[in-house]
Amino acid sequence: MYLIEPIRNGEYITDGAIALAMQVYVNQHIFLDEDILFPYYCDPKVEIGRFQNTAIEVNQDYIDKHSIQVVRRDTGGGAVYVDKGAVNMCCILEQDTSIYGDFQRFYQPAIKALHTLGATDVIQSGRNDLTLNGKKVSGAAMTLMNNRIYGGYSLLLDVNYEAMDKVLKPNRKKIASKGIKSVRARVGHLREALDEKYRDITIEEFKNLMVTQILGIDDIKEAKRYELTDADWEAIDELADKKYKNWDWNYGKSPKYEYNRSERLSSGTVDITISVEQNRIADCRIYGDFFGQGDIKDVEEALQGTKMTREDLMHQLKQLDIVYYFGNVTVESLVEMILS
């Protein structure tokens, strides 16, 4: 099994979108006639399942405030928050594709490794999770691409659980969506379950311990590596920019949904029903007892096609004389209402 890590010119890359683009690029373009292991850890990131509605999975206000990355992966499953307190063990398996869909076999090397490190109470639970004393410490996903299994799982050493709790609590109200919602589960951490000699390890050390256990080697230096070339990295950068750092992929792929907001503003009650498709406003209707002079249909039409982001909504509404349409109301208050 080859080891590939996000190391570029001697520097460890912690950009989660780059890590994902690297895996996809290798799966599509690099064939070594052996299985490949991609372990990585990254800056705070929410990874969205391929078929999920980003808008209802995350608290966008919290994401914006704390500069947390949102990336949609190519495999299914639920939304997950990871940071430098988690190791993500991804792989390409081509030697035995019968493992596809069999999460028990897929997880076996990880379970064995964790037991060796002292976390003997880690077990597989449900279809694709690992739990420790009833708390989730890992979730897995896989897909079949190019006749190879592409999949992986996270291992929660000790992530920021406050951030995880807040970022995965959507704040939009009254949404009726056709998207698949994540199943919320209590989560735990692995650090406290490790043997005492491992409990103060860094995330880098934990990653290396898992790799050596899975590869059956004594030292990470013994691993058989494939070093990504400059040409590889250029292609990875391009893929990340075009897809995994692209708003249309990460947000615009969300299913259609509708929601309603009604709020008492300074000029009266404003009631707005919005239909969102590809995370842009497809249609909206505005009602209320506010004192405006203009035809509110002008505002409804102006909002059509606008991205559901604070920046785009502010820009679009500032093109209008909001006081003319709503009375003593600010653009900021309308945007806050739409996004609340």
From Swiss-Prot:
Top EC class of this enzyme: ligase
PROSITE patterns per UniProt: BPL_LPL_CATALYTIC (PS51733)
Residues in BPL/LPL catalytic domain copies: 31-222
Keyword Nucleotide-binding among record annotations: yes
Catalytic reactions of this protein: L-lysyl-[lipoyl-carrier protein] + (R)-lipoate + ATP = N(6)-[(R)-lipoyl]-L-lysyl-[lipoyl-carrier protein] + AMP + diphosphate + H(+)
GO cellular component entries: cytoplasm
Gene3D superfamilies xrefs: Bira Bifunctional Protein, Domain 2, CO dehydrogenase flavoprotein, C-terminal domain
UniProtKB keywords: ATP-binding, Coiled coil, Ligase, Nucleotide-binding
GO biological process: protein lipoylation
Entry superkingdom: Bacteria
Coiled coil (residue ranges): 293-321
Binding site for (R)-lipoate: K136
Key word Coiled coil present: yes
Pfam families, A to Z: Lip_prot_lig_C, LplA-B_cat
Residue sites binding ATP per the record: R73, G78, A79, V80, Y81, K136, A140
Record function comment: Catalyzes specifically the lipoylation of GcvH-L (SAV0324), likely via the ATP-dependent activation of lipoate to lipoyl-AMP and the transfer of the activated lipoyl onto the lipoyl domain of the target protein. Can also utilize lipoamide as substrate for GcvH-L modification.
Name listed for the protein in its UniProt record: Lipoate--protein ligase 2
Organism: Staphylococcus aureus (strain Mu50 / ATCC 700699)
